[in-house]
Amino acid sequence: MRYSKLTMLIPCALLLSACTTVTPAYKDNGTRSGPCVEGGPDNVAQQFYDYRILHRSNDITALRPYLSDKLATLLSDASRDNNHRELLTNDPFSSRTTLPDSAHVASASTIPNRDARNIPLRVDLKQGDQGWQDEVLMIQEGQCWVIDDVRYLGGSVHATAGTLRQSIENR
């Protein structure tokens, strides 16, 4: 009788531990070499656009906490290349050449998968009475959410390609 209780207890304990252990789809989100901005993907994107509107500059080092390591490297390399000077002199983070007066980033709360590595978020931008929409791609580096790309959706696009990355990559 003593062994029968023990033989029932062990499988039940294993079954219970198997039911309560949840592993994320991606165990490692990589490392991050730069500083970090606190918040979820939509919060970090909103802080980025608020910072850009307030400071009105394309200083890559000041924007570094908001950008992925790869995008920051691409922008830094592009800033030394005369072929990309016009794009970087204007607003590379928007479809339009001039900075917006306001920006509203869509909520990421509607995204069902908490383990998502890439989260595209729509951004409603306005300058005066004109409004347009772009899309920002957020990724997770380590524990930080950062901007990895901007998709230009705003109609009169000043860039040479449909996304920021495509516009500054040397092909």
From Swiss-Prot:
InterPro entries cross-referenced by the UniProt entry: DUF3828
Lipidation (N-palmitoyl cysteine): 19
Pfam families membership: DUF3828
Taxonomy, superkingdom: Bacteria
The protein, known as: Uncharacterized lipoprotein YbjP
Recorded topology in the membrane: Lipid-anchor
Annotated signal peptide: 1-18
Gene Ontology terms: cellular component: plasma membrane
Alphabetical keyword list: Cell membrane, Lipoprotein, Membrane, Palmitate, Signal
Main location: membrane
Compartments it resides in: Cell membrane
Record keyword Flavoprotein present: no
Lipidated sites in chain (S-diacylglycerol cysteine): 19
NCBIfam families per the UniProt record, alphabetical: PRK10533.1 (NF007824)
